């Protein structure tokens, strides 16, 4: 995961100090790209321990098309708690847009199911794109999409993914985002009969919050350890049938976690 540490170091050293929506203050750079060969190990940050249960359950929650945190709370995942209202609702966030995008004529579009069918039917398409950035729905969202758009690419029997992330909290958020979209790529590859290719992560505003600087410095002192391996239950042939128990990370040997406050 040297790619991630290079980003962290660059923003720490060269980032421009800017105010932000949360009032915390950031150092940021604009435009950064990382590439991970998914056949060479699962891109899970090892220089601090990540909460795997949160990463996996959040992705499964997105794929369920849900926008209420009840499912997450049931599985002891609290990463969305600060943004939910008293009933646990977040408005039309990722799950709604992925699975139930409101079409102009009123019918709902299941982008993920369409993507599955299109990869099988037309793998060379340049339109294998999913968007969570629904301009009409943004005012109703508790938090507008940070990871806004992603595209798939099939070549030589391998499935690759590129994510565009408009806003990237590089200490807390980006390690989760890398793992989440790498996991999604593996899952999609399995159910479409493909091998995995690359995960390409393109960042817009890549920022380090002012109250994460000390933690980032600690992390940069640590030498990355070998990447773990993702094992998916080979019996699963439908993307929507995956459960938490079907997803296993083997050989994850991280350094201790580094706590940092979330900017809300």
UniProtKB/Swiss-Prot annotation:
Subunit organization: Homodimer.
Main location: cytoplasm
Active site, UniProt feature: 146
Localization per record: Cytoplasm
Superkingdom in the source lineage: Bacteria
GO biological process, one term: dTMP biosynthetic process
Family the UniProt entry places it in: Belongs to the thymidylate synthase family. Bacterial-type ThyA subfamily.
Name of one Pfam family that matches: Thymidylat_synt
GO annotation, cellular component aspect: cytosol
A GO molecular-function descriptor: thymidylate synthase activity
Pathway noted in the entry: Pyrimidine metabolism; dTTP biosynthesis
Bridged cysteine pairs (disulfide): none
PANTHER family in alphabetical order: THYMIDYLATE SYNTHASE (PTHR11548:SF9), THYMIDYLATE SYNTHASE 1 (PTHR11548)
InterPro entries: Thymidate_synth/dCMP_Mease, Thymidate_synth/dCMP_Mease_dom, Thymidate_synth/dCMP_Mease_sf, Thymidylate_synthase, Thymidylate_synthase_AS
PROSITE patterns linked: THYMIDYLATE_SYNTHASE
Keywords of this entry: Cytoplasm, Methyltransferase, Nucleotide biosynthesis, Transferase
Gene responsible for this protein: thyA
Binding, (6R)-5,10-methylene-5,6,7,8-tetrahydrofolate: 51, 169, 263
Positions that bind dUMP: 21, 126-127, 166-169, 177, 207-209
EC numbers on record: 2.1.1.45
Protein name, as recorded: Thymidylate synthase
Function text: Catalyzes the reductive methylation of 2'-deoxyuridine-5'-monophosphate (dUMP) to 2'-deoxythymidine-5'-monophosphate (dTMP) while utilizing 5,10-methylenetetrahydrofolate (mTHF) as the methyl donor and reductant in the reaction, yielding dihydrofolate (DHF) as a by-product. This enzymatic reaction provides an intracellular de novo source of dTMP, an essential precursor for DNA biosynthesis.
Catalyzed chemical reaction(s): dUMP + (6R)-5,10-methylene-5,6,7,8-tetrahydrofolate = 7,8-dihydrofolate + dTMP
